[in-house]
């Protein structure tokens, strides 16, 4: 028996279908799809429970696709049998069709990490799953997996990503299990090899920043930061406008940006560095990545004599690592010297001040002391720089 349902949400049509579609009920299927209004903004057809579709059913689907014209049209959750039909007939080449997720269970699996978006479970000796929290947007999950794959293809050393699966009612992405420790862990375990580990840190950052792309599906890091300015709290309208002015003045670029090149996101396997957490892969000028390291190890560092809970080491050790990293990356000790060889270095500190505002002046993660630090950087450093660079506000 064929069952269909139609829901219109914010002008978008969501259709679910169940059963088999053949010549006997194709007309019924067509009548159900004909109920989709002409003024919809797009269509998603969920066929998770469709067991079979004949050529008559395919023509009904094709007719709906033609009615949509250039509007978004997606078919999702096709079973392997139905997906085979779409691929054999060429429909998979003219429509956006996604197969159903493989289902697994994480019952009894070890939790090896938790983050803002979800949890990581060890599936077996070779694979892990990053299982997103239940409210995660499926499009975000697909986007993050796509970025991880693109990073690997472009030559960025990163974990191999497999498929999107469903586990215990939640969606996740299966990745290669990298049997190694992070660069941060190695530094904490053997301080005598600090220079060697910092050299590895420099090398992996240079490798990422040497890769360029014009792939339109990889987002602009600059534009992502611009969009986030609206979420900053506790500043005046003028200060917010200066944040917009600053980011608009930053040069565009086609360099690959990881977005969070800290030593906890770099695994070392068989002497080679491998990056994890590719969700912010973007393009922009290299100073974006380097400024985030500066922000994290200098402006977000604990006070002298205190313990840095993020890096799990004394604040003085974090400072030492950054100073060695800077010297290794630029071949000198100061930004003024580095700028003589690379004019883009003039953006290093301003972008770090900007990052302080974008991180510390949002949400409740940072305490009042850090919010005060960020406001000081905004008012005493970033705004004066922006006024010099762009001119005073009219």
Question: PLM features: residue spans?
Answer:
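Short beta-strand/loop segment at the start of cytosolic alpha/beta domains
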Residues: 1-16
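Amphipathic alpha-helical interaction surfaces in cytosolic regulatory modules
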Residues: 21-95
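Conserved N-terminal boundary motif of the eukaryotic protein kinase catalytic domain
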Residues: 103-111
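ATP-binding pocket architecture of kinase catalytic cores
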Residues: 110-111, 116-216, 251
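Active-site acidic catalytic loop and adjacent metal/ATP-binding pocket
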Residues: 112, 119-123, 243-288
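Helix-rich C-terminal or lid/interface subdomains of diverse kinases
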Residues: 199, 309-394
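An alpha-helical support segment within catalytic cores of ATP-dependent transferases
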Residues: 210-259, 263, 269, 386, ...
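Active-site Asp-x-Gly
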Residues: 269-319
């Amino acid at each position: 028996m064929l069952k269909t349902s139609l829901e219109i949400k914010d002008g978008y049509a969501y259709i679910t279908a169940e059963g088999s579609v053949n010549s006997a009920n194709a007309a019924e299927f067509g009548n159900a799809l004909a109920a989709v209004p002409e003024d919809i903004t797009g269509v998603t057809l969920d066929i998770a429970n469709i067991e079979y579709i004949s050529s008559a059913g395919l023509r009904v689907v094709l007719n709906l696709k033609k009615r949509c014209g250039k509007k978004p049209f997606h078919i999702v959750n096709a079973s392997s049998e139905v997906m085979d039909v779409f691929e054999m007939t060429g429909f998979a080449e003219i429509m956006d069709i996604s197969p159903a997720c493989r289902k697994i269970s994480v019952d009894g699996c070890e939790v090896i990490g938790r983050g803002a978006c979800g949890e990581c479970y060890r599936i077996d000796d070779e694979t892990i799953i990053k299982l997103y929290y239940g409210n995660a947007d499926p499009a975000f999950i697909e986007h993050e997996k796509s970025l991880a794959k693109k990073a690997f293809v472009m030559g960025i050393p990163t974990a191999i990503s497999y498929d999107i699966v469903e586990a215990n009612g939640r969606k996740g992405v299966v990745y290669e299990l990298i049997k190694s420790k992070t660069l941060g862990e190695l530094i904490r375990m053997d301080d005598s090899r600090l220079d060697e580990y910092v050299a590895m840190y420099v090398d992996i950052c240079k490798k990422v920043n040497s890769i360029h792309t014009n792939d339109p599906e990889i987002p602009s890091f600059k534009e992502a930061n611009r969009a986030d300015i609206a979420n900053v709290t506790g500043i005046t309208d003028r200060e917010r406008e200066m944040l917009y002015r600053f980011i608009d003045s930053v040069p565009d670029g086609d360099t690959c940006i990881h977005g969070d090149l800290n030593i906890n996101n770099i695994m070392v396997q068989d002497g080679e560095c491998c990056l994890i957490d590719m969700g912010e892969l973007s393009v922009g000028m290299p100073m974006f990545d380097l400024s985030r390291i500066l922000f994290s190890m200098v402006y977000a560092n604990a006070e002298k004599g205190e313990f840095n809970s993020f890096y799990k080491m004394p604040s003085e050790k974090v400072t030492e690592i950054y100073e060695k990293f800077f010297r290794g990356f630029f071949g000198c000790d100061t930004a003024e010297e580095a700028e003589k060889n690379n004019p883009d270095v003039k953006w290093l500190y301003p972008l770090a001040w900007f990052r302080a505002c974008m991180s510390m002046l949002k949400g409740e993660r940072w305490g009042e002391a850090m919010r005060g630090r960020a406001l000081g950087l905004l008012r005493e450093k970033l705004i004066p720089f922006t006024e010099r660079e762009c001119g005073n506000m009219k």
